[in-house]
Amino acid sequence: MARGARYRVPLKRRREGKTNYYKRRKLIISGKPRLVVRVLSRTAIVQIAKATPKGDVVIASAHSNELKKYGWKGYRRNTPALYLLGFLAAKKALKQGVTEAIVDIGLHRPVKASRVFAAVKGALDAGLKIPVGDGVLPEDDRVRGEHIANYAKMLKESNPELFKLRFSGYLSAGLDPESLPEHFDSVKQKIEEALQ
């Protein structure tokens, strides 16, 4: 494994594929709080964190399981859910006195209109100042889940068995996938009212 006397072993979190220290260093040098977006295998987390010499301090955080408190019945890792998480985390951060942040997407690839940037759009709409280009943010209809509702409508007409299989989570939670945009609007309104 070693390649000679001068071989330097990478840091542990870099070897494990968890941290890109070159990106992290540039983010920390800015001195601004970071909007940290992490989409995991079953959940998603959006945090506002500040780097200190002893480690990161989380100022505000929103976990996908928190959306249940506000009545969210949909999938907790899709574009509308990540938007709501970004919105929720930013509202909490604004209450703590944070007004601006920079985006930390970790090892996620920066794909235009992706779930990660849906969370950023949610934070922007909540009132947080984040330097980001408009070209990477998803459209409003996609954020509301209209693409999911249209797909559900098409699938319900063409293949009802597959519709029941694909949207079994929505149906068991008592949510018609075709009414996802209206459900999204009501949950966003509840978050806004709760964190005035």
UniProtKB/Swiss-Prot annotation:
Disulfide bonds: none
One Gene Ontology biological process: translation
Keyword RNA-binding among record annotations: yes
One Gene Ontology term of the molecular function aspect: 5S rRNA binding
One family name in Pfam for this protein: Ribosomal_L5e
GO cellular component, one term: cytosolic large ribosomal subunit
Highest taxon of the lineage: Archaea
Keywords assigned by UniProt, alphabetized: Ribonucleoprotein, Ribosomal protein, RNA-binding, rRNA-binding
Family: Belongs to the universal ribosomal protein uL18 family.
Assembly mode: Part of the 50S ribosomal subunit. Contacts the 5S and 23S rRNAs.
Annotated function: This is one of the proteins that bind and probably mediate the attachment of the 5S RNA into the large ribosomal subunit, where it forms part of the central protuberance.
PANTHER family on file: LARGE RIBOSOMAL SUBUNIT PROTEIN UL18, RIBOSOMAL PROTEIN L5-RELATED
HAMAP family membership: Ribosomal_uL18_A
Protein name: Large ribosomal subunit protein uL18
Gene: rpl18
